[in-house]
Every structure is written in structure tokens, then in C-alpha cells.
Swiss-Prot record:
<keyword id="KW-0996">Nickel insertion</keyword>
<comment type="function">
    <text>Required for maturation of urease via the functional incorporation of the urease nickel metallocenter.</text>
</comment>
<keyword id="KW-0963">Cytoplasm</keyword>
<protein>
    <recommendedName>
        <fullName>Urease accessory protein UreD</fullName>
    </recommendedName>
</protein>
<comment type="subunit">
    <text>UreD, UreF and UreG form a complex that acts as a GTP-hydrolysis-dependent molecular chaperone, activating the urease apoprotein by helping to assemble the nickel containing metallocenter of UreC. The UreE protein probably delivers the nickel.</text>
</comment>
<keyword id="KW-0143">Chaperone</keyword>
<dbReference type="Pfam" id="PF01774">
    <property type="entry name" value="UreD"/>
</dbReference>
<dbReference type="GO" id="GO:0016151">
    <property type="term" value="F:nickel cation binding"/>
</dbReference>
<comment type="similarity">
    <text>Belongs to the UreD family.</text>
</comment>
<dbReference type="InterPro" id="IPR002669">
    <property type="entry name" value="UreD"/>
</dbReference>
<dbReference type="GO" id="GO:0005737">
    <property type="term" value="C:cytoplasm"/>
</dbReference>
Length: 271
């Protein structure tokens, strides 16, 4: 007897390219496939804003999404999402999200998606690859919430792999790998993991002035309710937040990002 048919999974791909003409950034390349789209709202200012939209309504077991962003010399791209990305319960297969970002000479990319929300028993593997020119600027913020705290859901089990690799001028300057799997509720309660907190976030800022802005970043964290801290080395600045729920973390992070960037977050963050 033939086995059960394989379930249909969502596959999506987006490619966004931005160049600079007369000091203003413009879209130079767009490609979309499957259930992933990118929309460019009208915004004031020199940057192109791209909003990633998942028409599948979330990410389920076995889904695979690929995102490529390239800022050509002197261009500035800001990439965001209109809502939290929901990672639904899996019956065994792992969803994958692959992000590749290229930032050429004098260009800038701000990677500012809203939080990733992991449902109980979700399985996700994400990989970020970032290639920077020596004088490029890259700012990324990523937040993860474990379980729907507002609905009383504890993430009892699940799987998360989160890999970051950043090169500048062809040399590796940052690599970070997180892997938590199995009884996540128990793991998150451990003092050496999350001490019972249910949301965490990472900010990475790579720029010629990154190390010089460390005191500024720490000062902006002084009034935060989350546990947080920042450090800087080798032309990059890294900051982390840890909070009991995503609402607390989000309030702290929004205040930090608005001040640190010197500009408000994309309007979709307020929807």
C-alpha cells in the first residue's frame, strides 16, 4: 500500500536590490516567488524601505523561505515585517529560513523585522549570512518569543537553531550559533540559559563608528526593565535583551532603536 501523500509545504523567495542615484536610494532589483512578497511603501528620506510579507500567514513544519538583500555602493535599505512571524507547532519536520545580505562600499542595511513567535512544539532553523565592504554599515535586530505568554501557553518542547555569520572585507568578524532543543520549558528555566524569561533579542551594529558608540548604547539601556547589556570590539557592537515576556522586551527595544538609529522605526511596527 502506498504511504500517505507528503503534505504540501510553503516555499517562498524574495530578492531585493537597492542602488544609489544622485544621493537617493532606489530599487534596482526585485524578484518574488511562492508565498513571500516584498512591498515598498512610500517613505520620506534617502532610504528604500522594504516590507516582507508572508502570504502563507506563518511558518509551519517543513516550510522554507529564502531572503536576499543587496545594497549597492552608497545605497541604504531598511527591511522590516508587518507583524510577528509565527512559527507553528510541528509534527516533526523543521522549518527553514535563510537570509543573505550584501552591503557594498559606503552602503547601509537596517534589518528590522518584528519578533519571531515560537508556538509550543515549533521547530525552526535560521541562518543569516552577511557580507560587508570594509566601510559598510549594518544594523540588525532580532527578537524571539517562546510561547504565547499572553494566552498562558508555555513552550514545553521545541527546536531552535539560529546561526549568524558576518564577514567584512572577506574576513570573518562575527559568528554566533544558538541551538536549543527538546524540553524547552525546562531549559529556559535554567539560570544559565534564560532564568525563566520567555523572550530574548540581539542587536548587531557593524560600522566604522561602532566601538565609539558603546557608551551611548549602554546609557540608552539604563532605564530598561529587561536584563540587557552591550559590548563592542573589532568594529562592531553587540547588545542583548532578556525579558519575561515579549511586550516588556519590545518596549525597551523600541525605545533603544528609535534613539540609537536617530530615526523612528518603520511605520509597520506601529500597526
Amino acid at each position: 500500500m502506498a504511504g500517505a501523500p507528503r503534505r504540501q509545504r510553503a516555499v517562498g523567495r524574495v530578492r531585493l536590490g537597492v542602488n544609489a542615484i544622485a544621493g537617493k536610494s532606489r530599487v534596482s532589483d526585485v524578484a518574488e516567488a511562492g508565498s513571500l512578497r516584498v512591498r515598498m511603501p512610500r517613505v520620506d528620506g534617502p532610504a528604500v524601505e522594504g516590507v516582507l510579507v508572508n502570504t502563507a500567514g506563518g511558518v509551519a513544519c517543513g516550510d522554507h523561505f529564502t531572503i536576499e538583500v543587496k545594497a549597492e555602493a552608497g545605497a541604504h535599505a531598511v527591511v522590516a515585517t508587518p507583524a510577528a512571524e509565527k512559527i507553528y507547532r510541528s509534527d516533526g519536520e523543521t522549518a527553514r529560513i535563510d537570509v543573505a545580505i550584501t552591503v557594498e562600499a559606503g552602503a547601509q542595511v537596517d534589518w528590522l523585522p518584528q519578533e519571531t513567535l515560537l508556538y509550543d512544539a515549533a521547530r525552526l532553523a535560521r541562518r543569516f549570512t552577511v557580507d560587508l565592504a570594509p566601510d559598510a554599515t549594518f544594523l540588525a535586530f532580532e527578537a524571539i518569543a517562546f510561547g504565547r505568554v499572553a494566552r498562558g501557553e508555555e513552550m514545553r518542547t521545541g527546536h531552535l537553531e539560529d546561526h549568524w555569520q558576518v564577514t567584512r572585507g572577506g574576513g570573518l568578524i562575527y559568528a554566533d550559533a544558538v541551538r536549543v532543543s527538546g524540553p524547552l520549558g525546562e531549559l529556559l528555566r535554567r539560570p544559565t540559559v534564560a532564568a525563566g524569561n520567555r523572550a530574548w533579542a540581539t542587536l548587531l551594529y557593524v560600522a566604522p563608528d561602532a566601538e565609539a558608540r558603546l557608551d551611548e548604547a549602554r546609557a540608552l539601556m539604563e532605564s530598561a526593565r529587561s536584563e540587557c547589556g552591550a559590548s563592542a570590539w573589532n568594529g562592531l557592537l553587540a547588545a542583548r535583551w532578556l525579558a519575561p515576556d515579549i511586550e516588556t522586551l519590545r518596549r525597551d527595544a523600541v525605545a533603544f532603536l528609535n534613539a540609537f538609529r536617530g530615526a523612528p522605526l518603520p511605520r509597520v511596527w506601529a500597526l
